[in-house]
């Protein structure tokens, strides 16, 4: 007789196991693993006995560490665990009747200044890794830097939060960043686009799908200028081709930086050129920043970058919703 598929959660709340208290009242748990935004979690509960609203009501700043577990899902004897990370409770609400609650958390440093306090500072003769390392140390995070380091002659943070400024620096050079499990992770999109697909999805392995392709807001090339240190003249560098040219006011310090800035502009814009939204059963190996092969969908077949994964778990069901971008549409075409 085939083993029954099983799903469960482990939840550590402020350092204490809490799943035994959450399980009887939980209606839905969602976990969104995203490239462009902080990861989030949400618990929807039915508080019929008023335990949460009277005695266990959460506080903003509480720490939740959930973990998803599955058994026998893809084959008998399979046991998988997905560590969702560490989340700060940033929002909760209760309503009646019936008495229901929602507890929401975001993956971010416990110190809210990272996303709330505006700062001004100038960096000179720095690197992206050096700047990221300073922020990681400031907020008690470990730094994971999965990219070639980039020299930054001079850059200014002007009345910006540390989070916004770091995102600006990363996007400028075609890098991504997120806070996950008390780590500040930075990666190079070019490097991650080149990864081998972690899994192949076909029509019989998905529950629903939608494909969308657009030219609006996408570009074939961009011009970035820099000043020649010898002649003092401005030099234009074309990245890509001229068919649909993006106009940017960003200036570079040299030719190499101009190319990186141009690539960053195109990588950010063209990730929305061709996209797929797919709902699947749980494949815990599929995480944001990985790649997946789409096969059996006709002309939509290709390798895609996973932009986000939303896990939705109820007592009866477990679905994953994938947001994908077509890597061949993001690739830089040279004239």
What is the predicted role of each segment?
Residues 78-95, 121, 155, 190-193, ...:
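Short, compositionally biased
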Residues 52-142:
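Surface-exposed cap/loop segments at beta↔alpha junctions
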Residues 41-44, 105, 120-144, 157-180, ...:
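Amphipathic, non-transmembrane alpha-helical segments in extracytoplasmic/periplasmic proteins
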């Amino acid at each position: 007789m085939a083993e029954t598929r099983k799903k469960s959660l482990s939840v550590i709340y402020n350092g204490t196991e809490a799943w035994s208290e959450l399980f009887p009242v939980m209606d839905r748990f969602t976990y969104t693993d995203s490239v462009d935004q902080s990861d989030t979690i949400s618990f929807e509960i039915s508080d019929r006995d008023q335990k949460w609203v009277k005695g266990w009501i959460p506080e903003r700043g509480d720490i939740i560490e959930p973990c998803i577990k599955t058994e026998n899902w893809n084959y008998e004897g399979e046991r998988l665990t997905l560590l969702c990370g560490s989340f700060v409770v940033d929002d909760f609400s209760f309503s009646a009747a019936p008495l229901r609650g929602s507890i929401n958390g975001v993956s971010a440093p416990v110190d809210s200044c990272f996303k709330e306090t505006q700062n001004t500072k100038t960096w000179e003769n720095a690197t992206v890794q050096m700047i990221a390392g300073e922020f990681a140390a400031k907020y008690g995070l470990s730094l994971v830097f999965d990219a070639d380091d980039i020299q930054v002659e001079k850059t200014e943070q002007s009345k910006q939060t540390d989070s916004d400024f770091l995102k600006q620096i990363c996007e400028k050079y075609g890098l991504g960043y997120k806070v996950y499990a008390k780590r500040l992770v930075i990666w190079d999109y070019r490097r991650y686009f080149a990864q081998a697909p972690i899994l192949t999805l076909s029509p019989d392995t998905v529950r629903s799908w939608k494909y969308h392709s657009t030219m609006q807001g996408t570009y074939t090339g961009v011009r970035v200028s820099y000043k020649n240190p010898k002649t003092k003249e401005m030099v234009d560098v074309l990245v890509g081709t001229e068919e649909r040219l993006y106009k940017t006011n960003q200036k570079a310090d040299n030719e190499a930086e101009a190319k990186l800035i141009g690539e960053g502009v195109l990588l950010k814009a063209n990730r929305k050129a061709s996209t797929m939204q797919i709902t699947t059963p749980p494949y815990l190996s599929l995480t944001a920043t990985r790649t997946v092969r789409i096969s059996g969908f006709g002309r939509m077949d290709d390798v895609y970058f996973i932009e986000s994964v939303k896990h939705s778990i109820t007592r009866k069901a477990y679905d994953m919703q994938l947001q994908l971008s077509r890597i061949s549409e993001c690739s830089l075409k040279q004239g």
